[in-house]
Amino acid sequence: MDYNNASPWQGREKHHRAAIDAALKAGVKHIVYTSLAFANPSKAGVMTAHIRTEKHLKDLEKEGKVSITIIREGLYNESWPLYFGYYFGLKEETRKEVLVAGDGRVSWTSIPDMAFATAKILSAREGEWIGKTFYLSQKKTWSLEDIARLVSKAKDNEIKLKVVGRKEYEDFYVTEKGMERPSVEWWSSSYDALKDGECAIDDPTLETILKEAGRKPKSLDDTIMEMLR
C-alpha cells in the first residue's frame, strides 16, 4: 500500500505499472485509466499512486508508445461512511458524535452513474476521448456536515460532526477504535484535500452523458437513506 510514504513504484502504483507494461508488451495502442477525483497535485495520500500512474502514462504518450484517456472517477456516494469517521456500522452505529479531521464540499457520485458513463466512454466511436483527462462527478456538492444532517434524519437521532486536528483524529481512531496507525495517518491526509476544495468538481462530462441518456445523477441523500434503511 501507500502507507509509510512508499517510494515511487513501491506503492499501489507498482501493480498499475505491471498492468501497463503487460498491455504494451501485448501490443495495446490505447489505455483508458480510471484515476480518482482529487486534484493533481493533491494533499491526499490516497491520490499518490494515481498521480504517479497518470504521469507515467503521459510520459508514454509523449514518447509515442501509446495513446491514453484518463478518467478521474468521482468519490462514490457509497463511500461516505469512510469519510464520515469510518461509520461502517451504519444502522448499528451508536455514536452520537463523529470525529473527522476536516470538512469540505464533495461532488459525491453514485457507482451506477459512473459505471454507466464509463461504459459509454469505452464504447464511443474511435478517437473521441483520446488524449483527454476529465472527471466523472456530478456538480452538486455535499459537506460532511450535510452528511451528519442526513444521517440524523435517516436514523431519527441527532448525530453531531466534530472537526478536530489530524493528530487528535489519528490518536482517537488508533487508541479508541483499535485501528492501525499507518492506515489512519495515511487516510487523514484526505481531510486536508477536502478542506482545500479538491473534491468539489466543476466538470460537466458525467451529467452531459447521463442527460443524453435521459438520466439524472443519483443524489447522495437517496444513497444515505437506502444504506441506513
Describe each model-derived feature in a short phrase.
Residues 207-229:
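Amphipathic terminal alpha-helices
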Residues 17-20, 111-119, 217-225:
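Short, amphipathic alpha-helical "lid/cap" segments that border enzyme active or binding sites
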Residues 3-11, 26, 37-160, 176:
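Oxidoreductase cofactor-interface core, primarily capturing Rossmann-like NAD(P)-dependent enzymes
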Residues 12, 16, 201:
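Aromatic/hydrophobic pocket-lining residues that form the small-molecule binding cavity
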Residues 29-30:
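Short acidic/polar active-site loop segments enriched in Thr and Asp
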